[in-house]
């Protein structure tokens, strides 16, 4: 069943609103500084968006341990995909991403 962009946007907004979202502006700034670019492709000269590693549609939330900065291209491409399978399809370096994610999570969660 096909949905219009408007219907999709409204449903997504309702899912986001219903999720427990506790990422603060301070935490978002810290995440952007720690990654220093798109967490997926590494681009640094682009505007970064909040991307949930576990998508909202699959029970994810906007929290310090579930959000990474992503460029618009990666964020749109990943959409509601599971991060590791999406990275494999895009031929991105999954191992480096996961190692970096663990390193950044441990440094930020302890702060």
What are these language model-derived features?
Residues 1-37, 98-103:
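Short, charged surface segments at domain edges that flank catalytic/cofactor-binding sites
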Residues 11-12, 56, 89:
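Small disulfide-bonded, cysteine-rich extracellular recognition modules and tandem repeats
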Residues 17, 23-25, 54, 69, ...:
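Low-complexity, compositionally biased segments
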Residues 60-65, 76-111:
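Polybasic, low-complexity binding patches
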Residues 73:
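Conserved phosphate-binding loops in nucleotide/dinucleotide-binding enzymes
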């Amino acid at each position: 069943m096909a949905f219009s962009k408007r219907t999709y946007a409204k449903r997504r907004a309702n899912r986001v609103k219903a999720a427990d979202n506790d990422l603060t502006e301070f935490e978002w700034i810290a995440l952007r500084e720690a990654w220093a670019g798109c967490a997926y492709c590494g681009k640094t000269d682009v505007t970064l968006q909040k991307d949930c590693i576990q998508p909202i549609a699959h029970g994810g939330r906007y929290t310090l341990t579930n959000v990474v900065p992503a460029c618009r291209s990666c964020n749109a491409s990943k959409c509601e995909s599971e991060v590791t399978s999406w990275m494999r399809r895009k031929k991105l370096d999954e191992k480096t991403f996961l190692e970096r994610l663990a390193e950044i999570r441990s440094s930020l969660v302890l702060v």
